[in-house]
């Protein structure tokens, strides 16, 4: 199983070990979700100010958040699907706020590693079409998150 992950660290404070952890968590999720080899995702680490701008500009929420995902497979209005092109499957982009991840790790009483793994997985599942807008969707998505985190060894 090979998931291509492009990391961009705008904070310049994310250690290679954290990127490796996220790579391994997302590889495990891709395996458990039967994602084909060669699929691509980008992960960008930002500060609270930057994620607040993105949240405001794209989601009309003028506040920082922990993770935002932009799925590439969702068709926008007026976009045409490219059929038959032999291109890798581009799943989308994950944007993670490092300060928010640190705050939440402390708030929830677990490690920064676990919080980063959780946030990356949460955003990744959104890229695959999972959501939590309804109680039923939330139960499915959070159940799957728990399964994958436990299989990886990051359960609570």
From Swiss-Prot:
Residues annotated as transmembrane: none
Upper classification of the organism: Bacteria, Bacillati, Bacillota, Bacilli, Bacillales
Pfam families documented for this protein: YbeY
Positions with a binding annotation for Zn(2+): 122, 126, 132
Keyword Glycoprotein appears in the UniProt entry: no
Entries under PROSITE patterns matching the protein: UPF0054
Enzyme class: hydrolase
Highest rank taxon of the organism: Bacteria
Cofactor note: Binds 1 zinc ion.
Gene name of this polypeptide: ybeY
GO cellular component: cytoplasm
Keyword terms, alphabetized: Cytoplasm, Endonuclease, Hydrolase, Metal-binding, Nuclease, Ribosome biogenesis, rRNA processing, Zinc
Organism the protein comes from: Bacillus cereus (strain G9842)
Similarity annotation: Belongs to the endoribonuclease YbeY family.
Enzyme Commission no: 3.1.-.-
Protein name in the entry: Endoribonuclease YbeY
Keyword rRNA processing: yes
MF terms in GO: metalloendopeptidase activity; RNA endonuclease activity; zinc ion binding
């Amino acid at each position: 199983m090979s998931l291509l992950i492009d990391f961009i660290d705008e904070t310049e404070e994310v250690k290679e070990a954290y990127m490796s952890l996220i790579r391994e968590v997302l590889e495990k999720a891709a395996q458990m979700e039967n994602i084909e080899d060669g699929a691509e995702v980008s992960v960008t680490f930002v500060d609270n100010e930057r994620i607040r701008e993105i949240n405001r500009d794209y989601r009309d929420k003028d506040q920082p958040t922990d993770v935002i995902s932009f799925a590439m497979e969702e068709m926008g209005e007026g976009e045409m699907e490219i059929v038959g092109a032999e291109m890798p499957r581009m799943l989308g982009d994950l944007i993670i706020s490092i300060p928010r991840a640190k705050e939440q790790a402390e708030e929830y009483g677990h490690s920064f590693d676990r919080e980063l793994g959780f946030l990356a997985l949460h955003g990744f599942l959104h890229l695959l079409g999972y959501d939590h807008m309804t109680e039923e969707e939330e139960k499915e998505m959070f159940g799957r998150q728990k399964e994958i985190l436990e299989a990886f060894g990051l359960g609570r």
